[in-house]
């Protein structure tokens, strides 16, 4: 049975992905891995909202998703960003299909808190059949984080949560959070494998700080019964060299050495 990797690419790193990154994806495809991509698009959404002069408000650091904001987000996520990624994969000889969580009932959600956050969903159910159909044909699904309710309302969902849900539904062997750093660093050296307990200690000690904390917390929350290994890797360089993944691996517990 083929192994599966899900990549989560944040909106801030998508346009900075290196040629080495795409070459590595190609190598993995050629060596028999199934691949799916979930992407964000925050910076591009903000830019488009400004261009269209759509007013926004923030609640607890999160942009409230009003109907006009949602329409803009869907336009950017399913349109500009999604097709940009598909095109970059095509340039590297890889077949990809751009979809969103609405397609084929992939991500089914309910309102997180409509009064507070607006059109934002919490994923309740996944149906990965559309992903399996694409993978069977050797096509990489590139997924925008949008979902649908049981009443067919469109909701925006957190891209990290979407990636975690997709990885869980696929029983993925690896979920890779693609960032602009080599992994979790302690000074100049990269920490290769960490458990949740070790990560908390590093946060308490200030080794993990600033913008790295939300990246690490996203990776931690993705660990589940169905996703046993999460990695933080660098999209600005090679993440797969000498037949090994380069980055920080986050596991529930380390294997005991007997």
Swiss-Prot record:
One of its GO terms (biological process) is arginine biosynthetic process via ornithine. Pathway: Amino-acid biosynthesis; L-arginine biosynthesis; N(2)-acetyl-L-ornithine from L-glutamate: step 2/4. GO terms for cellular component: cytoplasm. Transmembrane segments: none annotated. It is an enzyme of class 2 (transferase). It catalyses: N-acetyl-L-glutamate + ATP = N-acetyl-L-glutamyl 5-phosphate + ADP. SUPFAM superfamilies: Carbamate kinase-like. Substrate binds at residues 41-42, 63, 156. The record marks 8, 215 as: Transition state stabilizer. InterPro entries: AceGlu_kinase-like_sf, AcgluKinase_fam, ArgB, Asp/Glu/Uridylate_kinase, Glu/AcGlu_kinase. It comes from the Bacteria. GO terms for molecular function: acetylglutamate kinase activity; ATP binding. Belongs to the acetylglutamate kinase family. ArgB subfamily. This is Acetylglutamate kinase. It comes from Bacillus velezensis (strain DSM 23117 / BGSC 10A6 / LMG 26770 / FZB42).
């Amino acid at each position: 049975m083929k192994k599966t990797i899900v990549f989560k690419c944040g909106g801030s790193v998508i346009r900075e992905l290196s040629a080495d990154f795409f070459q590595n994806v190609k190598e993995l495809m050629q060596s028999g891995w199934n691949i799916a991509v979930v992407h964000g698009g925050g910076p591009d959404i903000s830019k488009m909202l400004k261009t269209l002069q759509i007013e926004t408000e923030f609640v607890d650091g999160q942009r409230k998703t009003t109907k006009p904001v949602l329409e803009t987000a869907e336009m950017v996520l399913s349109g500009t960003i999604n097709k940009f990624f598909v095109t970059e994969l095509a340039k590297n000889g890889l077949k990809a299909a751009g979809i969103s969580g609405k397609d084929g009932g992939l991500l089914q959600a309910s309102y997180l808190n409509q009064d507070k956050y607006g059109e934002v969903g919490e994923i309740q159910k996944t149906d990965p059949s559309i992903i399996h159909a694409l993978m069977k044909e050797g096509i990489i699904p590139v997924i925008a984080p949008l979902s649908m309710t049981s009443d067919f309302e469109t909701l925006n969902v957190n891209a990290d949560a979407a990636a975690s849900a997709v990885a869980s539904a696929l029983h993925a062997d690896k979920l890779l959070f693609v960032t602009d750093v080599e992994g979790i660093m302690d000074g100049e050296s990269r920490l290769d494998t960490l458990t949740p307990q070790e990560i908390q200690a590093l946060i308490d000690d200030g080794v993990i700080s600033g913008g790295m904390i939300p990246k690490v917390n996203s990776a931690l929350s993705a660990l589940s019964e169905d996703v046993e290994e999460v990695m933080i890797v660098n999209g600005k360089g090679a993440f797969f060299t000498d037949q090994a993944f380069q980055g920080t691996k986050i596991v529930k517990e380390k294997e005991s050495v007997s």
